């Protein structure tokens, strides 16, 4: 697990939302394309046809936690039996990992803090990865985004998924060197501050992720294309 996802501002909760009627099956020529399959699973998520388990991902260790509950999938606000309030505010569809199927990105108000939940499909199930605000900064239409763990620990990444769990692939970063000075990297190469600043300008100029105000009807319409 990347250190910018660990503890404090960068802790991540991964919810594995396993569809009760879904299972792995062999590919068939008559099967719908991956994006259509994903759309159907996302609709099942919002209609409540899911069994939900909650896992805390921290420092690379996965452990069940009873302190977190999934949102009521029939509404956008309120979680029974929990003192954590979850309100979905907006959403976007975006193929983050380039596999031909869109992820469903939800922006949420989570107990007064803005966070994100990224739904992806794997092996006939929906997986939801919850990321704090500073772990998914300035998301762009090309699937890239920035993260920050402090003044000398920040950068930009692309996402990939391992068994439904989001993993950061950093392609740019600033960190603190052994001498206390900033160290800059881009695409695996060391660069100077000026080049890193130029990269940040280029990243900022990219088209932003297009958000839509959340409602179940709006999600259904977007999934229908």
Task: Label every PLM stretch briefly.
Residues 87-96, 135-145:
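Beta-propeller blade termini
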Residues 1-9:
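Bacterial N-terminal signal peptides that target proteins for export
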Residues 24-62, 146-225:
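Acidic, small-residue rich beta-repeat scaffolds with periodic aromatic anchors
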Residues 32-85, 125-136:
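Blade-edge motifs of beta-propeller repeat domains
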Residues 115-139, 166:
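Extracellular C-terminal loop/segment signatures of secreted glycoproteins
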Residues 98-108, 142-147:
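Acidic/hydrophobic-patterned starts of short beta strands in beta-sheet-rich repeat architectures
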Residues 112-117, 154-158:
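Structural motif
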Residues 18-21:
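C-terminal motif of bacterial Sec signal peptides marking the signal peptidase cleavage site
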């Amino acid at each position: 697990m990347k250190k910018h996802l660990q503890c404090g501002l960068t802790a991540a909760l991964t919810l594995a939302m396993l569809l009760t009627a879904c299972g792995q099956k062999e590919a068939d020529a008559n099967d719908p394309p991956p994006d259509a399959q994903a759309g159907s699973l996302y609709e099942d998520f919002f209609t409540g046809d899911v069994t939900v388990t909650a896992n805390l991902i921290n420092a690379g260790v996965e452990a069940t936690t009873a302190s977190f509950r999934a949102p009521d999938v029939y509404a956008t606000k309120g979680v029974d039996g929990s003192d954590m309030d979850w309100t979905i505010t907006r959403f976007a569809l975006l193929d983050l990992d380039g596999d031909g199927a869109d992820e469903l990105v939800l922006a949420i108000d989570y107990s007064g803090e803005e966070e994100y939940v990224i739904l992806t499909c794997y092996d006939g199930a929906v997986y939801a990865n919850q990321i704090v605000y500073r772990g998914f900064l300035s998301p762009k239409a090309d699937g890239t985004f920035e993260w920050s763990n402090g003044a000398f620990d920040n950068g930009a990444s692309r996402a990939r998924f391992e068994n439904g769990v989001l993993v950061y692939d950093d392609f740019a970063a600033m960190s603190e060197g052994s001498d206390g000075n900033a160290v800059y990297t881009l695409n695996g190469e060391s660069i100077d501050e000026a080049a890193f600043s130029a990269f940040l300008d280029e990243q900022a100029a990219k088209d932003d992720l297009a958000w839509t105000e959340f409602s179940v009807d709006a999600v259904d319409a977007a999934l229908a294309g």
